[in-house]
């Protein structure tokens, strides 16, 4: 697997970018210079490709400990495939940064200069001063505000080759292709259509227990204004339109620095609950507003490939505009959950809570949907006719056929002549066409490309 290393002096935002790209809080971040001294690493996916992301310690000659960190960082950089060098956009370029950057450039690897903390027009003007580093690829970011990352991801994706699949999915897909006969309908795994498992997640005190109580119409969990009252997961079931909906009320997730004892255990339980859920209700506090921790929790939901409904609780106390809020969530904070419906409720008064029950049934139906192979291929043919596949260095790229090979979540295989040539933007176009035609609201849609008649995912 290819690796991407984040390098830069202390406090330029490496750990924040690492957390943003990993969609979870792994590295400790603060405004104190040099908070991260050890090398952190985690597997990530950028669009349809996977990579190992490495967060190095800060480069600084002023401290004996940091001299050792710098030595180790340069060693790891030599072993990495792609280098992202971060600088602070609120400060003028200095000779030390240039020296570090030029030493990395000599390694002959793909390298980009990432100017972080570009939060306003004044910062944008100052960022141009970094052009004298003599590098073609410069990206202005505001990691805190999630601005500028799309361009960086698109550049990174060009250098990544290994396709991302859900853990254990590679073996499942290859086994499917080995036994599948083209043109025939596939027998899917059995999914109990009458029992739906729903996990309720969110940070502390957003009203998850109140929501559960409103859904089941009884006081099952202890409800209190004290943060973190609910520690143990609590299961309750309701019957709605002849379907059993089992709810799990999870302990609230705090910022990691505040997690102690039972709450640390509860955080681990939350992960386990998500792994056994089919649909997640991601509860947000519409009165207090949203923060970075909400995004981390949303990342946990995305990581488990669940159906999802975003619940704006305490809406009766909110002064937000609903349409603007939905746009902010889908286009900014939760781009990776842009398919999730957003529903406003007031758990305490019970207002609009009933809407959730119908929506859960609808999302579950989408989550377990089976697409007829002939209809899927008709759609793919029409889509490629309307917008032909781009050539790969002058060579024709062709999709022979498409087939759904799994459900819950739905997974589709594209059998091609040159699967690695399928750009993420074209795959996203196909995803949008499939979503529009077959209604996959609220569920992730996995698309994998494979070479015809081979387990290889590219031409030999």
UniProtKB/Swiss-Prot annotation:
Keyword DNA damage part of the UniProt annotation: no
GO molecular function: GTP binding; ribosome binding
Pfam family, one: MMR_HSR1
EngA-type G domain mapped to chain residues: 2-164, 196-368
Residues covered by the KH-like domain: 369-453
Known role: GTPase that plays an essential role in the late steps of ribosome biogenesis.
PANTHER family: GTPASE DER
The protein's name in its UniProt record: GTPase Der
UniProt organism field: Campylobacter jejuni subsp. jejuni serotype O:6 (strain 81116 / NCTC 11828)
């Amino acid at each position: 697997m290819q690796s991407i290393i984040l390098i830069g002096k202390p406090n330029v935002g490496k750990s924040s970018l690492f957390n943003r790209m990993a969609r979870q809080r792994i590295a400790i971040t603060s405004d104190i210079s040099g908070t991260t001294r050890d090398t952190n690493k985690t597997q990530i996916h950028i669009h349809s490709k996977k990579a190992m992301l490495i967060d190095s310690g800060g480069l600084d000659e002023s401290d004996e400990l940091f001299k050792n960190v710098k030595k180790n960082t340069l060693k790891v950089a030599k072993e990495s495939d792609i280098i992202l060098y971060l600088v602070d956009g609120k400060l003028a370029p200095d000779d030390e940064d240039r020296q570090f950057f030029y030493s990395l450039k000599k390694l002959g690897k793909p390298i980009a200069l990432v100017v972080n903390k570009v939060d306003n027009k004044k910062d944008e003007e100052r960022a141009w001063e970094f052009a004298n580093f003599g590098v073609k690829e410069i990206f202005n970011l505001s990691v805190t505000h999630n601005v500028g990352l799309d361009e960086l991801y698109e550049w990174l994706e060009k250098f990544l080759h290994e396709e991302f699949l859900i853990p254990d999915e590679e073996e499942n897909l290859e086994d499917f292709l080995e036994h599948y006969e083209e043109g025939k309908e596939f027998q899917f795994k059995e999914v109990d259509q009458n029992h739906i498992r729903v996990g309720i997640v969110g940070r502390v005190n957003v009203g998850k227990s109140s929501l559960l109580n409103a859904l089941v119409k009884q006081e099952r969990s202890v409800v209190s204004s004290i943060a973190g009252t609910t520690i143990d997961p609590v299961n309750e079931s309701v019957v709605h339109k002849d379907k059993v909906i089992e709810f799990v009320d999870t302990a609230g997730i705090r910022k990691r620095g505040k997690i102690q004892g039972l709450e640390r255990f509860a955080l681990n339980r939350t992960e386990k609950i998500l792994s056994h859920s089919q649909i997640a209700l991601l509860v947000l506090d519409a009165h207090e507003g949203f923060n970075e921790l909400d995004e981390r929790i949303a990342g946990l939901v995305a990581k488990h490939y669940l159906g999802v409904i975003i619940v704006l609780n305490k809406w009766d106390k909110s002064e937000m505009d609903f349409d603007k809020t939905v746009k902010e969530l889908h286009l900014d904070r939760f781009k990776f959950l842009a398919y999730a419906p957003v529903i406003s409720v007031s758990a305490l008064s019970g207002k609009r809570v009933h809407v959730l029950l119908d929506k859960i049934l609808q999302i579950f139906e989408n989550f377990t949907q089976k697409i007829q192979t002939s209809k899927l291929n008709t759609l793919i043919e029409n889509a490629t006719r309307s917008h032909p596949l781009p050539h790969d260095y002058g060579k024709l790229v062709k999709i022979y056929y498409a087939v759904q090979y799994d459900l819950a979540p739905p997974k589709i295989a594209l059998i091609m002549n040159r699967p690695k040539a399928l750009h993420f933007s074209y795959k996203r176009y196909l995803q949008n066409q499939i979503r529009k035609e077959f209604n996959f609201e609220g569920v992730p849609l996995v698309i994998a490309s494979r070479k015809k008649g081979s387990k290889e995912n590219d031409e030999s």
